[in-house]
């Protein structure tokens, strides 16, 4: 009888442990802004127009468009179609030098990204980015914080100009 109770207890404990491990995964939902400092601007601009206006705003605000990556372009290359989706990576050499002088490990954060997504239901696009201060905050470095505060103003202006 002791063995029977013990066996049931072990099975119960195993099932309970498994349930607790699986419960968070089953209850998870997509979090649109999982990081602090994430800004999303819904626009009435079509995807292509927002891509163009963001590139122009980056240039007008004297920042560099370091690179672009597009899942939409990648999907098209294999014969698939998905809603507009592009990341534009932005920085500038003088900020890179200051960043690396303050913290070499922080170099992984640059360039800072703008993310454009198309709403297939409306055809309108959204612009999302993380404020530079939130990107660099985890490094707890006064020089990075000062630089990030300058970049916050520039990135907010780029976003504002792009969505006009």
Question: How should each PLM-predicted stretch be described?
Answer:
Residues 2-14:
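Bacterial N-terminal signal peptides that target proteins for export
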């Amino acid at each position: 009888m002791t063995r029977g109770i013990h066996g049931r207890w072990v099975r119960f404990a195993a099932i309970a442990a498994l349930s607790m491990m699986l419960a968070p995964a089953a209850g998870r939902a997509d979090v649109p802004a999982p990081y602090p400092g994430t800004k999303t601007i819904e626009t009435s601009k079509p995807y292509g127009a927002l891509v163009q206006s963001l590139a122009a705003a980056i240039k007008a605000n004297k920042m560099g468009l370091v690179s672009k990556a597009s899942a939409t372009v990648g999907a098209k290359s294999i014969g698939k179609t998905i809603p507009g989706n592009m990341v534009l990576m932005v920085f500038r050499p003088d900020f890179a030098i200051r960043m690396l002088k303050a913290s070499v490990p922080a170099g992984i954060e640059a360039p800072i990204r703008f993310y454009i997504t198309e709403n297939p239901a409306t055809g309108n696009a959204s612009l999302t980015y993380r404020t530079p201060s939130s990107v660099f905050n985890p490094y707890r470095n006064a020089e990075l914080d000062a630089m990030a505060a300058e970049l916050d103003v520039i990135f907010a202006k780029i976003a504002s100009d792009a969505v006009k």
